[in-house]
Every structure is written in C-alpha cells, then in structure tokens.
Amino acid sequence: SGQSWRPQGRF
C-alpha cells in the first residue's frame, strides 16, 4: 500500500 503522508508502504 502507500499512505499520503508516508508513501513508504506501511507504517
């Protein structure tokens, strides 16, 4: 996946 604030995948 990939967040808007953290385009790393998952956090």
From Swiss-Prot:
Query: Cellular component per GO?
Result: extracellular region
- Per the record, the domain of life is Eukaryota
Supply the alphabetized keyword list.
Amidation, Hormone, Secreted
Keyword Secreted in the entry? The reply is yes
Q: Which residues carry this modification: Phenylalanine amide?
A: 11
Question: Primary place of residence?
Answer: secreted
* One of the record's GO molecular function terms: hormone activity
Its subcellular locations are: Secreted
State what this protein does: Potentiates the beat of the ventricle, and also has excitatory actions on the penis retractor muscle, the buccal muscle and the identified neurons controlling the buccal muscle movement of achatina.
Protein's recorded name = Cardio-excitatory peptide 1
